[in-house]
Swiss-Prot record:
Its EC number is 1.2.1.27. It comes from the Bacteria. Pfam families: Aldedh (PF00171). Belongs to the aldehyde dehydrogenase family. IolA subfamily. The gene is iolA1. It is an enzyme of class 1 (oxidoreductase). It comes from Shouchella clausii (strain KSM-K16) (Alkalihalobacillus clausii). This is Malonate-semialdehyde dehydrogenase 1. Homotetramer. NAD(+) binds at A154, F156, K180, E183, R184, S233, T255, E386. It catalyses: 3-oxopropanoate + NAD(+) + CoA + H2O = hydrogencarbonate + acetyl-CoA + NADH + H(+); 2-methyl-3-oxopropanoate + NAD(+) + CoA + H2O = propanoyl-CoA + hydrogencarbonate + NADH + H(+). The active site is at C288. InterPro entries: Ald_DH/histidinol_DH, Ald_DH_C, Ald_DH_CS_CYS, Ald_DH_N, Aldehyde_DH_dom, MeMal-semiAld_DH, MSDH_GmP_bac.
Length: 491
């Protein structure tokens, strides 16, 4: 008897309020990284699909931009309530597609919802300013307006939170939006789009086109897309920034990271170990705010390494849907193999392997265990490169200043953390570290939605960051009106 073939569902693009098939004949499998099960197929869409979506967005923008700001805000409040209603379903979709455990997925959903809540404050955010007397009988006012059709290119590692940095604010401020999500996590995006429609967002205001290079290039080249928001790797981010800038678009490109954490002798050791283990190994290290390097003062180093090793070895690895699991898989086989190659490179270059994640590789999914290196130096590949996996390097230092100097040598400058009870050390750290987001006695210094996600150096290309007031400026343009009203006689 022959084998039974189970047909896998093909995901569609979301354009002008409808799910429609892509014009492509090329599809890619979407795989549950914990089980290697094919859960659907995603289209590698074409520039023609981008063109269709942009036309729909452009048409919708003409009406949506004229909708009263409080009305747009109420729709965003509706959306927030629907996301709250379906939080558990959203979290499960994230775990199935991405692999992170359910607790982390629920946290991501909550951060996405918080971004929607911030965007729902559009009436306050869009307010301009004025000066009633700049000369005799002359006043001036500054107004904000949406910029048009904008595009977002999002990664696989935060399939809800990162898109929610982008489209809720953009559409709340009156723009129309085209999202290219990661082709590895399409099901979560389907749910986000359906809930937007349920919330009352008109057809064409929000559109989704799945794909790879052709879709990205179609967005970067299209003259009717006025701005591009990107989150992803450094090489792709550089390309997006250059290409979009050449085509005279606004661009914000949030790229790679190599986040350093400094642990001083006076730190609460157990607290530091718990937070650093979560920051380094949570989400399988696949996040731009992961702790990648720890510089620890010599007086506490032996105890720190021993406790961190024990903590890493105690972490439960497995399918994120299962109770008690902390560490899920990396996203794909090639990511696992790339991580193994970095571990081998670290050993080859002379680092000491304290905890070897290769010993916990599983055939069931794309799993690799927590990995810790000691005796790492700044000329080693594992210190320089963004590995994007549960791999942590430890360097012993004499003092805070040496730890800061090491961190500042990195080409990346997304985040940095300090564990200490010394307020003077905190101030010195804040004033001398080259990084855009700092954490004191915490492992992941990602800010709330109302502050900018403010990476420095090769972690960000652009002027206006995602989130906070920067995002309002990014998605709006200003119009200044100077008016003269000659004073009549009221005598």
């Amino acid at each position: 008897m022959g084998e039974t073939t189970v047909e896998v569902r093909k995901v569609k693009n979301y354009i002008n309020g409808k799910w429609i098939e892509s014009s492509t004949s090329l599809y890619e499998d979407v795989v549950n990284p914990a089980t290697k099960e094919v859960i659907c197929q995603v289209p590698l869409s074409t520039k023609a699909d981008v063109e269709y979506a942009v036309e729909a967005a452009k048409t919708a923008f003409a009406k949506w931009s004229k909708v009263a700001v409080p009305r747009r805000a109420r729709i965003l409040f509706n959306y927030q309530q629907l996301l709250q209603r379906d939080k558990e379903e959203l979290a499960r979709l994230i775990t199935i597609e991405n692999g992170k455990n359910l607790t982390e997925a629920r946290g991501e959903v909550q951060r996405g919802i918080e971004n929607v809540e911030f965007a729902a404050g559009a009436p306050s955010l869009m307010m301009g300013d004025s000066l009633p007397m700049i000369a005799t009988d002359v006043e001036a006012s500054n107004y904000r307006y949406p910029i048009g059709v904008v595009g977002g290119i999002a990664p696989f590692n935060f399939p809800m939170m990162v898109p929610c940095w982008m489209f809720p604010m953009a559409i709340a401020l009156g723009n129309a939006f085209l999202l290219k999500p990661s082709e590895r996590t399409p099901l979560l995006t389907e749910k986000l789009a359906d809930l937007l429609t349920e919330a009352g967002v008109p057809d064409g205001v929000f559109n989704v086109v799945y794909g790879a290079h052709d879709v990205v290039n179609g967005m970067l080249e299209h003259p009717d897309i006025k701005a591009i928001s990107f989150v992803g790797s450094k090489p792709v981010g550089e390309y997006v920034y250059k290409k979009a800038s050449e085509n005279l678009k606004r661009v914000q490109a949030l790229t790679g990271a190599k986040n350093h954490t400094i642990v001083l002798n006076d730190a609460d050791l157990d607290d530091a170990v718990t937070n650093i283990a979560g920051a380094a190994f949570g989400s399988a290290g696949e996040r731009c705010m992961a702790c990648a390097v720890v510089t620890v003062e010599e007086g506490i180093a032996d105890a720190f390494v021993a406790k961190l090793k024990a903590k890493a070895e105690s972490l439960v690895m497995g399918n994120g849907l299962d109770d008690g699991v902390f560490l899920g898989p990396v996203i794909r086989e090639e990511n696992k193999n790339r991580t193994i190659a970095y571990i081998e490179k670290g050993v080859e270059e002379g680092a000491t392997l304290v905890c070897d994640g290769r010993s916990r590789v599983s055939a069931d999914g794309y799993f690799i265990g927590p990995t810790i290196f000691e005796n790492v130096t700044t000329d080693m590949t594992i210190w320089k490169d963004e590995i994007f996996a549960p791999v942590l390097s430890i360097i012993r230092v004499k003092n805070l200043d040496e730890g800061i100097q090491i961190a500042n040598r990195s080409e990346f400058a997304n985040g940095a953390c300090l564990f200490t009870t010394n307020a003077a050390a905190v101030r010195y750290f804040r004033e001398n570290i080259d990084a855009g987001m700092l954490g004191i006695n915490l492992g992941v210094p990602a800010p709330m939605a109302f502050f900018p996600f403010s990476g420095w150096k090769s972690s960000f290309y652009g002027t206006l960051h995602a989130n906070g007031k920067d995002s309002v400026d990014f998605y709006t343009r200003k119009k200044v009106v100077t008016a003269r009203y000659p004073k009549p006689s009221f005598d």
